[in-house]
């Protein structure tokens, strides 16, 4: 979703508030067009009165229009109650990075809007590929030793490596990868069909 598209839709619909649904999962392919699109959607949130139902933790691998409509619907409703109708008692978003600091060979990310605190969900055995046909795939973890799944680091060479360690510390997560002694960049859930658990 591009900023220009938001302005166009606001004009067409005569509505100031604008919320969209994040692209969830897509068939696991090698290119990174899907995570780039998610990043573009995130950047559009810098515009005033914009919101998003984050779905990186939901969806189905082989169906970009999954059967679960309750998850995006309830997340969009929470945003509308809080941001449009002024209901401060309704939380409308989950944890998001507030401060990122490199500490030797690790990176610490401090999160805002942590609610009752950060937690990592258990991995489970399977994930939905297409629920219409009762098709489930086996979970394969990229960081089996890490508490939090989905982080990757890169050094000066620009090569990404899945984190060997990603541990919750209070309202933050400390991330490290043995293959990256001096991390310069970090990302989370950067895949077409990521398995994430924070």
Model-derived regions, located:
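Active-site proximal loops enriched in glycine and acidic residues that flank catalytic Cys/His/Asp
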Residues: 11-20, 54-56, 111-113, 155, ...
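Solvent-exposed beta-hairpin/edge-strand motifs
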Residues: 133-136, 141-156, 194-195
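Conserved, well-structured interaction surfaces
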Residues: 1-75, 82
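Short acidic/polar inter-strand loop motif in beta-rich domains
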Residues: 182, 190-198
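Solvent-exposed beta-strand/loop surfaces of large extracellular or lumenal domains
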Residues: 148-172
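A surface-exposed beta-strand-loop module
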Residues: 167-184
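Surface beta-strand/loop "capping" patches
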Residues: 83-140
């Amino acid at each position: 979703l591009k900023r220009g598209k938001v302005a166009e839709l606001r004009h067409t619909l005569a509505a100031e508030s604008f919320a969209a649904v994040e692209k969830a999962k897509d068939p696991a392919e090698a290119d990174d067009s899907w995570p780039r699109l998610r990043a573009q959607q995130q950047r559009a949130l810098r515009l005033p009165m914009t919101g998003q139902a984050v779905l990186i933790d939901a969806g189905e691998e082989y169906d970009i229009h999954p059967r679960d409509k309750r998850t995006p619907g309830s997340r969009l409703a929470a945003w509308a109650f809080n941001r449009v109708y002024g209901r401060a008692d309704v939380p409308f978003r989950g944890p998001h990075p507030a401060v990122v600091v490199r500490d030797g060979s690790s990176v610490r990310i401090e999160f805002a809007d942590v609610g009752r605190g950060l937690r990592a969900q258990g991995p489970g055995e399977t994930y939905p590929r297409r629920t219409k046909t009762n098709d489930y795939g086996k979970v394969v973890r990229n960081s089996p030793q890490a508490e939090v799944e989905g982080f990757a680091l890169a050094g000066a060479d620009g090569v990404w490596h899945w984190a060997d360690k990603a541990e919750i510390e209070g309202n933050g997560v400390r991330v490290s990868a043995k293959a990256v002694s001096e991390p310069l960049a970090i990302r989370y859930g950067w895949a077409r069909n990521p398995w994430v658990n924070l």
